[in-house]
Swiss-Prot record:
Record's compositionally biased regions (Low complexity): 18-32
UniProt cross-references to Pfam families, sorted A to Z: DUF7627
Compositionally biased tracts (Polar residues): 33-55
Region (Disordered) location: 1-130, 298-318
Protein name: Uncharacterized protein B0303.14
Source organism of the structure: Caenorhabditis elegans
UniProt biased composition (Basic and acidic residues): 86-121
Entry-linked InterPro entries: DUF7627
Amino acid sequence: MSRLAGRVVFPGEAEPQSSSTNSRAPESSSSSQETRQQNLANRFKPSNNYRSNRNQVEDGETTNSNRGKPRGKGPIRYQGNYSDRFVGRQEEAPRAEKSERSERPQRSEKPQDQNQREQVKPQRKQTKRVENVVASEELLELEDIIDQISDLNVRNDRSAAQIKRNILGSHDLIDTMDEDDWQKVCESMIKTALEQGEPEFIADLMVALFSNKLFAAVMSDELMKYVTKYIMEDDEMPIPSLLSAILCAHWPRQLAKAFDNINPILYTIVCLIKGWIEVVREDTERYYKEEKKPKYQVAREDSFEEPTPEPSKEEEEKIIEEPEMVNRCAVGLSDLCDTAQRQLWVNWMTVTDEIYQCIKPSITHNPNITGSVKGRLLDTFLQMNQWTKNRTASVKHAVTQTVGTSN
């Protein structure tokens, strides 16, 4: 606390009562001199007048004890703390917000009833299925089914799903069809796949009609006839593309098996493909025979040598096929892999492995296969090596070289 003789006066505070030390009434010259001397003496003594006046409370007036009072000489007016400047602003802010809220237009009350909610919400049109939009056609005769499959004028205005739905919807006609009728339908299906280039559509239709056992039996016989013609007569029809589409079609899990009692169509196709493999392999073994690796055997005292089996008469008398047929079978295997691609390895891994093991020695050691056919087999062999690789991104490094220009 500074030792000052002056008295601090605050606004609104009454002056303290006059004391003997601070009275200024001029009574006499002697008294005035005494007061001057006494005031000079009091300058160097600590005064408690400020402390006593600080806490005085007069009638109707109070002092704010929370605020710190400035200390100095003479009458000083208190102007408040720095934080007091923002008190008014903080009080004005919520008032302004309330006024803005009152000025905003009030939202309409939400409808509580379900009927009102349906009226307020915009109703979206639900997506409809094709079956609900386009009515199925009723097929009454066999020619109607054949036209739906093979006639381009009829198929031009109908999708594949609609044609399949029309055929499956005519139960009365399908249940009364005999073997000759199914043979006509199967021939039209195979011709549509080969001549019009739509093997996927025909394969999908086969899966849909497979529940009819008579259709499955007739279709397997027709496929055998067309594939035999393709190999024996050097037919230029794209038979391998049709076979690959049937093998890679969306068969149900319980039907995707090459067994005669489960799926005769797949059984026939797999047997035909394995026949091509046997023809190429037997012809290659005439010039190159792969040595079998010795099996690891544990040495035992009581072990005995097993007698080597004698070659049977069938193995000694192998049928030697003509080079033209060997080349056709090799081309058929190559086209089958090229059209099916990796899906063949995913669905039929065993058949793909047999084709892979057959192609490699035929390229290197079979002189009966022509150069053009070997080139196609080599391309297929390189593609098959890529099927088993993981589809991971490889890291590549790119380097650029800049050439400075001379001024």
